[in-house]
């Protein structure tokens, strides 16, 4: 379980204050208007920024003083996920060893992950020779080989066309289900949330204003801000 317990952060006199609990195995879409605090929340969880007060716990253990590399998360962003001078094989391999000193079993893991996301035939190519969708598949494969129980996704597929975006979301959902991965994904697309998520967390005015099962993400929700967001998105 991931818990944000009265996590407060101030940026340019704007106060963000988050309370959120995510159960193991849930896929949670983090949604809300631009500037509401979605990426701030994700950055606090990842450890890129540190709260002024409050606690962040994973399975009961505080991680608030840990550096990003010490936290049990794999991360995937919209871009800048791959090293341009490394092959697909090595980019995936970084998920297992930062110095790429892989055992025979780990090399096999890399190949299996590439196979699962559909990039096995590109293992020896550089990222510049791949399409945008193929590059994101490689980045997803690197997440997959890491032993972390949770993925943090910050609009990783928003730049892709709708068909490819749907394909990638289905792949994330499938891989997460197979391994029991918990997913927290920022998205602006209501359709993406409903395609992949079991639950949602709606951020507005610097706080988590509403949470629930994904079927409750409708224009009939009690939150007026959420109602307006859903109507605008639809």
From Swiss-Prot:
One of its GO terms (molecular function) is ABC-type thiamine transporter activity. It catalyses: thiamine(out) + ATP + H2O = thiamine(in) + ADP + phosphate + H(+). InterPro entries: AAA+_ATPase (IPR003593), ABC_SmlMolc_Importer (IPR050093), ABC_transporter-like_ATP-bd (IPR003439), ABC_transporter-like_CS (IPR017871), P-loop_NTPase (IPR027417), Thiamine_ABC_ThiQ (IPR005968). Its main location: membrane. SUPFAM superfamilies: P-loop containing nucleoside triphosphate hydrolases (SSF52540). It is a peripheral membrane protein. It is found in: Cell inner membrane. Its EC number is 7.6.2.15. This is Thiamine import ATP-binding protein ThiQ.
């Amino acid at each position: 379980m991931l818990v944000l317990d009265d996590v407060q952060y101030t940026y340019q006199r704007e106060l963000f204050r988050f309370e959120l609990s995510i159960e193991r195995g849930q896929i949670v879409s983090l949604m809300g208007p631009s500037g509401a605090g979605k990426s701030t929340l994700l950055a606090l969880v990842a450890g890129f920024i540190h709260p002024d007060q409050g606690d962040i716990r994973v399975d009961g253990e505080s991680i608030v003083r840990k550096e990003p590399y010490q936290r049990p998360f794999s991360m995937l962003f919209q871009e800048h996920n791959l090293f341009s001078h490394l092959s697909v094989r090595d980019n995936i391999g970084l998920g297992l060893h930062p110095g790429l000193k892989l055992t025979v079993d780990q090399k096999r893991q890399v190949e299996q992950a590439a196979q699962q996301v559909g990039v096995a035939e590109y293992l020896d190519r550089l990222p510049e020779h791949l399409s945008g969708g193929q590059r994101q598949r490689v980045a997803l494969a690197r997440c997959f080989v890491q032993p972390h129980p949770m993925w943090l996704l910050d609009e990783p597929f928003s730049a892709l066309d709708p068909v490819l975006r749907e394909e990638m979301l289905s792949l994330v959902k499938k891989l997460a289900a197979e391994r029991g991965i918990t997913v927290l994904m920022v998205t602006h697309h209501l359709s993406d949330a409903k395609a992949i998520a079991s639950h949602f967390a709606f951020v507005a005015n610097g706080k988590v204003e509403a949470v629930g099962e994904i079927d409750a993400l409708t224009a009939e929700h009690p939150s007026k801000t959420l109602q307006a967001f859903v109507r605008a998105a639809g």
